[in-house]
């Protein structure tokens, strides 16, 4: 039998069938194309439907592939069994009306047993066939399979209702009775039975019948072959691995995860081993799914991703890993799979970003959620029906981000149930509330008859800062049209106005309204568009105003100038991003404010410092080039011919306004702009950050605000230079490096002294041994600085055989910590550190967990530590 790594084995399979005239088909995306019946591609044959149903004829009727697949119907079993995975690869060979069993079976036997290929021991191979399928039985015997290794089973008929169907044959590898989970004389101990000895490695379906609606079976005109071999399963045989998780597809991920823990190792105990497996499986699944375009959300595929990421994070927490960590494993996955699937490394930054964002959302509530979940489990244990209520499960989902399935799994592990019907009812009630809220908002809009009945024209005047003769044509007070406004607030409509109404990301103008005598009668605080596109001026009244009178409208010029600078700079920024990052970069939103601008855009990964510098320099260069800004009113069609970018889903009227800055930038836009780019003065990016999956945000300032920003930075630099005592600005970095080195040296000295102090304290603590039942216990509140010091004391205790049980606690900065360690004698008595810590933690306002021999917890009520220690000692005494 050949020893192959995963890459070699995958390629060998494809090469074998290529030698037999097959076309190698690249793996399809995990997201089904034009197949609404599937959430994910879950097998190799799922990508072949168009060929098997005759809607598409392949260039070659013989096809082979290694298809990435996801199955999520039994996520809760992943990590708890040897073979369950959410993400896996299905190797397959397919015949679309070409060869049939006379070729498929001998080829399978050849690939498995030939020394040129896998070279598996023939005596280890078995197969099952459909009892009436004598042809397959005979072909197997002819190929070389011993007749007594062929089992006839009624289950060997592939049929999912109407459509193609037929008998199948499954191939099994005998792993030996020593690897079995049932007795040798167990009735399930046979190939195809429920046992761990005979591992199914390959399934060949002979699709030769058509299942009619009337229940009859008729021959298909073209017979097809559909096969599936689990890459991970066969690899476990080739690498002599007990389970799929000990192969080179998983072990590097598991080892990388071990490095993130506080010393936990795969295989040390069942609980931790399960957690390692879950993390390794789930990071593979989410990495490939995101690379193929899926993103976390609350429905469909997105919900599956969210559930997998959060399930992995929950298990990371159980291993003692703090904070977001799963995203750090993406490059490990990418490196393993790079030879056949380069997309992970190609999109590494984007995938990491999506996972990290999702993790950080969950991490913010994880600790609190776990504490609450522990409380709910204890509450349910003490209830008559041993059930977590649907209301409580929904609170875990709605408030703390725990998908129902995570609560269900935790309850199941504790021997409890969850009220699923109650959870569903709470979920539906929330949806109903949201739907009603949306309906109320819509109905409010529909029922705003007052604004809808305003038909008078109200024109906005570009380039005007003051309108001396604006006629007041409508007044709205308390949702009613009136002729006179003399209260505190009103909404006004003028026949013409210089005030820009908020639209397209640009906020509204502010300013004042004056009477013909020059008296200020109202302050304009906002301007919005009415249903019939009039400009609604929201004002704070100073003097009464009357319909039909003319007023002088004056906008805040400084605010308008800031808006013009920001809006034109936004266009330049958009164009610069497309030039530096590529034309795939699209605007996803913007805010044009007088003090700054915010621009959201599509991006697969964070911008590099070099890219940011290039964008900033390009925008400033266009500002200093003094480009004339040209506006044109035209049709949408003509605007597109001019090269203008059409935003906002292309929803435009008969006429559009195109804003051009030479051939560098051209966009449909109704906002206010500078006349020449040199009026912007200067442009400075202040931040670049993530908004969500696949979206980045740039914030920037212009003109006077940019000068103020740079002046503040310069002043800050002067302060830093003075603090670090650098002779000149260019020496600041070297000076800081020197200070950091000194700090590191000092920290090492502090740590060394702390260690000596802790050793001295350990002697005092460990001398005080108490008796609890027939076990010896050391229990104390130690004068140390938190959990790290407690762990160090626990390590000292382990090396000295000081007692059977160690219970140490500490108070630091108003927080409580506790650690419990058990030696073998205590474990033999049936004690578990995790159970003891869960009993103690609520007494000091905390939660925790751990392994049978060691557990730890943190809380917010240090005043409860003495009671907690007493509770642990009492529990030990009563054991």
From Swiss-Prot:
PROSITE patterns according to UniProt: AA_TRNA_LIGASE_II_ALA
InterPro entries cross-referenced by the UniProt entry: aa-tRNA-synth_II/BPL/LPL (IPR045864), Ala-tRNA-lgiase_IIc (IPR002318), Ala-tRNA-ligase_IIc_anticod-bd (IPR018162), Ala-tRNA-synth_IIc_core (IPR018165), Ala-tRNA-synth_IIc_N (IPR018164), Ala-tRNA_ligase (IPR050058), Ala_tRNA_ligase_euk/bac (IPR023033), DHHA1_dom (IPR003156)
PANTHER family documented for this protein: ALANINE--TRNA LIGASE, CYTOPLASMIC (PTHR11777:SF9), ALANYL-TRNA SYNTHETASE (PTHR11777)
Needed co-factor(s): Zn(2+)
Record keywords: Aminoacyl-tRNA synthetase, ATP-binding, Cytoplasm, Ligase, Metal-binding, Nucleotide-binding, Protein biosynthesis, RNA-binding, tRNA-binding, Zinc
UniProt remark on domains: Consists of three domains; the N-terminal catalytic domain, the editing domain and the C-terminal C-Ala domain. The editing domain removes incorrectly charged amino acids, while the C-Ala domain, along with tRNA(Ala), serves as a bridge to cooperatively bring together the editing and aminoacylation centers thus stimulating deacylation of misacylated tRNAs.
Localization, UniProt: Cytoplasm
Name of the molecule in the record: Alanine--tRNA ligase
Reaction(s) this enzyme catalyzes, per UniProt: tRNA(Ala) + L-alanine + ATP = L-alanyl-tRNA(Ala) + AMP + diphosphate
Function: Catalyzes the attachment of alanine to tRNA(Ala) in a two-step reaction: alanine is first activated by ATP to form Ala-AMP and then transferred to the acceptor end of tRNA(Ala). Also edits incorrectly charged Ser-tRNA(Ala) and Gly-tRNA(Ala) via its editing domain.
Class of this enzyme: ligase
């Amino acid at each position: 039998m050949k020893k192959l790594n995963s890459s070699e084995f995958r390629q060998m399979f494809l090469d074998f069938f290529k030698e037999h005239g097959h076309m190698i088909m690249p793996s399809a995306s995990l997201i089904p194309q034009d197949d609404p019946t599937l959430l994910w591609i879950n097998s190799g044959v799922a990508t072949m439907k168009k060929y098997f149903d005759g809607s598409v004829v392949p260039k070659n009727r013989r096809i082979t592939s290694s298809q990435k697949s996801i199955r999520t119907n039994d996520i809760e079993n992943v990590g708890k069994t040897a073979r369950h995975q959410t993400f896996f690869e299905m190797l397959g060979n397919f015949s679309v009306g070409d060869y049939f069993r006379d070729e498929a079976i001998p080829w399978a036997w050849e690939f498995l047993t030939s020394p040129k290929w896998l070279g598996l021991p023939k005596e280890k191979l078995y197969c099952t066939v459909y009892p009436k399928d004598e042809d397959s039985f005979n072909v197997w015997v002819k190929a070389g399979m011993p007749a007594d290794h062929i089992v006839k089973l009624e289950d060997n008929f592939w049929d999912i209702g109407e459509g193609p169907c037929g008998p199948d044959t499954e191939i099994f590898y005998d792993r030996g009775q020593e690897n079995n989970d049932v007795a040798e004389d167990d009735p399930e101990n046979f190939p195809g039975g429920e046992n761990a000895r005979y591992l199914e490695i390959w399934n060949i379906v002979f699709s030769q019948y058509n299942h009619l609606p009337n229940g009859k079976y008729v021959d298909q005109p073209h017979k097809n072959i559909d096969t599936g071999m689990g890459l991970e399963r066969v690899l476990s045989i080739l690498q002599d691995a007990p389970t799929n998780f000990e192969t080179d597809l998983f072990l590097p991920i598991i080892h990388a995860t071990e490095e993130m823990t506080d010393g936990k190792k795969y295989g040390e105990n069942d609980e931790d081993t399960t957690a390692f497996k879950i993390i390794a499986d789930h990071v593979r699944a989410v990495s490939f799914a995101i690379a193929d375009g899926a993103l976390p959300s609350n429905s469909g595929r997105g919900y599956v991703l969210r559930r997998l990421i959060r399930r992995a994070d929950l298990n990371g927490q159980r291993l003692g890993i703090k904070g977001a960590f799963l995203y750090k494993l993406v490059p490990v996955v990418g490196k393993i799979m790079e030879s056949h699937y380069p997309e992970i490394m190609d999109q590494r930054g984007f995938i990491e970003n999506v996972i990290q964002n999702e993790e950080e959302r969950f991490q913010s509530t994880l600790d609190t959620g776990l504490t609450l979940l522990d409380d709910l489990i204890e509450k349910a244990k003490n209830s008559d029906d041993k059930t977590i209520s649907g209301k409580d499960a929904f609170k875990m989902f709605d408030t703390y981000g725990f998908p129902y399935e995570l609560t269900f799994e935790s309850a199941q592990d504790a021997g409890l149930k969850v009220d699923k019907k109650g959870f569903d009812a709470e979920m539906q009630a929330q949806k109903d509330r949201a739907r009603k809220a949306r309906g109320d908002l819509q109905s409010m809009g529909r029922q705003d008859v007052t604004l809808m009945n305003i038909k008078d024209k109200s024109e906005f005047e570009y380039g005007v800062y003051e309108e001396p003769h604006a006629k007041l044509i409508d007044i709205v007070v308390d949702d009613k049209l009136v002729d006179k406004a003399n209260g505190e607030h009103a909404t006004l409509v003028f026949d013409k106005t210089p005030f820009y109404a908020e639209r397209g990301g640009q906020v509204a103008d502010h300013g004042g309204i004056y009477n013909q005598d020059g008296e200020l009668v109202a302050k304009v605080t906002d301007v919005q568009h009415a249903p019939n596109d009039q400009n609604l001026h929201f004002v704070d009244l100073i003097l009464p105003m009357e319909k039909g009178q003319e007023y002088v409208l004056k906008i805040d010029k400084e605010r308008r100038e800031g808006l013009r600078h920001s809006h034109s700079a936004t266009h330049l920024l958009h164009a610069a991003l497309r030039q530096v990052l590529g034309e795939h970069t699209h605007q996803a939103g913007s805010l044009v404010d007088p003090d700054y601008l915010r621009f959201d855009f599509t991006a697969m990964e964070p911008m590099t410092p070099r890219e940011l510098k290039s964008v900033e320099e390009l925008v400033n260069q266009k500002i200093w080039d003094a480009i004339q800004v040209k506006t044109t009113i035209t049709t949408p069609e003509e605007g597109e011919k001019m090269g203008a970018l059409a935003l906002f889903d292309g929803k435009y009227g008969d006429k559009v306004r195109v804003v051009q800055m030479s051939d560098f930038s051209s966009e449909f836009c109704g906002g206010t702009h500078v006349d020449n780019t040199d009026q912007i003065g200067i442009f400075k990016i202040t931040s670049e950050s993530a908004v969500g999956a696949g979206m980045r945000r740039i914030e920037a300032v212009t003109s006077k605000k940019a000068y103020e920003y740079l002046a503040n930075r310069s002043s800050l630099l002067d302060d830093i230079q003075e603090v670090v005592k650098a002779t000149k600005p260019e020496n600041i970095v070297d000076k800081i490096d020197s200070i950091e080195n000194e700090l590191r040296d000092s920290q090492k000295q502090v740590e060394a002294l702390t260690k000596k102090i802790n050793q001295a304290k350990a002697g005092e603590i460990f001398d005080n041994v108490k008796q609890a039942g027939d076990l010896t216990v050391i229990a104390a509140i130690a004068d140390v600085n938190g959990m790290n010091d407690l762990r160090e004391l626990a390590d000292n205790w382990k090396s000295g055989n000081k007692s059977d049980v160690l219970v140490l606690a500490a108070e630091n900065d108003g927080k409580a910590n506790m650690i419990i360690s058990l030696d073998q004698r205590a474990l033999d008595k049936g004690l578990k550190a995790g159970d003891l810590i869960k009993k103690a933690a609520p007494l000091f306002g905390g939660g925790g967990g751990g392994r049978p021999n060691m557990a730890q917890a943190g809380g917010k009520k240090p005043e409860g530590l003495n009671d907690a220690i007493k509770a642990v000692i009492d529990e030990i005494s009563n054991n």
